[in-house]
Amino acid sequence: MSVKVRDSLSGGLVEVGGDGRVGIYVCGPTVYNHIHIGNVRGHLFWDVAVRFLRSRGYRVKFVWNITDIDDKIINRANEEGVSWKEIVRRYTDSFHERLRLLGIGMPDVEPRATEHIPEMISLIEELIRRGHAYPAPNGDVYYAVETFPRYGALSKQRPEEMKITEKGQTGHKRNPLDFTLWKASKPGEPSWESPWGPGRPGWHIECSAMVEKHLPGGADIHGGGSDIRFPHHENELAQSCGAHPDRPFVRAWAHHGMVRMAAQKMAKSVGNVVDAREATLKHGRDAIRMWLLQSHYSQPIDYSDEILEEKRRSCERLLRLYREISRSEASSPLSDRLAGELRERFDAAMREDFNTPEAIAALFDAASGAGREISSRPSAAGEFASLKEALQELLGLLGFDVAGERVSEVDGVRIRHAGEAPGEVLERVARRERARRRREWPEADRLREELLREGWAIEDTAAGPVLSRR
């Protein structure tokens, strides 16, 4: 069976991986700040998509980039009085830490823009040779959009309707819509030598060069947020197809919807962001996965504490049903039927544009089927081995925590708990245990009651506290 992706350019479903191989390129972060929970959406979704493809035998090469030179990075460095390289190091580490908290795997290749300056210069030279780009007297180089007749096809805009996105002087441009391929250096800014003088690359040329370097046959899927469909992806398309008109660039463009807060796009420029680390520690990894995966990746999604709490309860319900049958060693005909239907529905959903909401619905339906049987006949709990195996495999594929008892150590306190527990909950359990050791009983009781109100029970044992869901 094939895997199909809804292509933003054509609007149709495009089959990928016909030869058993899939190359995926996703635009990564510009590392000048901590990533927020809206930034996480694309990385978490593509982590799941790649897991699914590999589970079905596809050989996947997965690439996302790090934009490590940009005006925002330079401005942040100047504000803090440190080098731009220190800003890049700090926020790349921060990005990786937040991915680990969410259980998001790393790509096969994570190229950095500054490691590909020669490839960018070669690409710009080819665009100039073909008449798609021109150097300006001040050392800048611009792409001439009027030389590319398909400009606007990806974003479904006519050039005369487009908003000019580049700030600053346009006196050297032939057309206000022309965009920068190479920026002449300014005093004190990082720069690299080029045929047009010292400078640095524009944002859009970076991804074109890195796709060409790491996926030389073109990307089967190019992912990114719907907010960069224009101008970034539109400009990538113009650059790569302008330089290599006879070479495939992207077979399917896949854009994920924006995360909204109070009906407004979550963005640093708006000031309504929630740090991905803060959200993960507060709500837990599984709740965030359930929240993001129960909506189709292409649709916008709303964030609030209330929504995340609802998703946490939903996830806990599913995992509780799984744990009810987790000790099964025999398989009844009902178990085999539910397992077979689950695998079939899950596979069909994921092969049709990675439909995670339908895949999760299949998980709930199968688990609920087992739950109804156990409610009417408790002894049936040991007869669902085949369904247990299917649930374990598919929940794990989506990145949910299906482990049994865990032990977390927080500030010297060992805490046992079933499955995942949010970091801030574990911190309060540790505070309570330290209060008990100091015989500060009112504080220990206060923390216990606070956690009880939030649905967490604590059992005090000689080996330390045991945390569980009520």
From Swiss-Prot:
One Gene Ontology biological process: cysteinyl-tRNA aminoacylation
NCBIfam families, per the entry: cysS (TIGR00435)
Motif mapping: 'HIGH' region: 29-39
Residues bound to ATP: K268
Cofactor(s), names only, from the UniProt record: Zn(2+)
Pfam families, per database record: DALR_2, tRNA-synt_1e
One GO cellular component, as annotated: cytosol
Binding residues annotated for Zn(2+), in chain numbering: C27, C207, H232, E236
Keywords, in A-Z order: Aminoacyl-tRNA synthetase, ATP-binding, Cytoplasm, Ligase, Metal-binding, Nucleotide-binding, Protein biosynthesis, Zinc
Stated name of the protein: Cysteine--tRNA ligase
Note on how the cofactor is bound: Binds 1 zinc ion per subunit.
UniProt-listed Gene3D superfamilies: Cysteine-tRNA ligase, C-terminal anti-codon recognition domain, HUPs
Motif 'KMSKS' region boundaries: 265-269
Domain of life: Bacteria
Localization annotation: Cytoplasm
Source organism of the structure: Rubrobacter xylanophilus (strain DSM 9941 / JCM 11954 / NBRC 16129 / PRD-1)
GO MF entries: ATP binding; cysteine-tRNA ligase activity; zinc ion binding
Subunit structure: Monomer.
Catalysed reaction, written as an equation: tRNA(Cys) + L-cysteine + ATP = L-cysteinyl-tRNA(Cys) + AMP + diphosphate
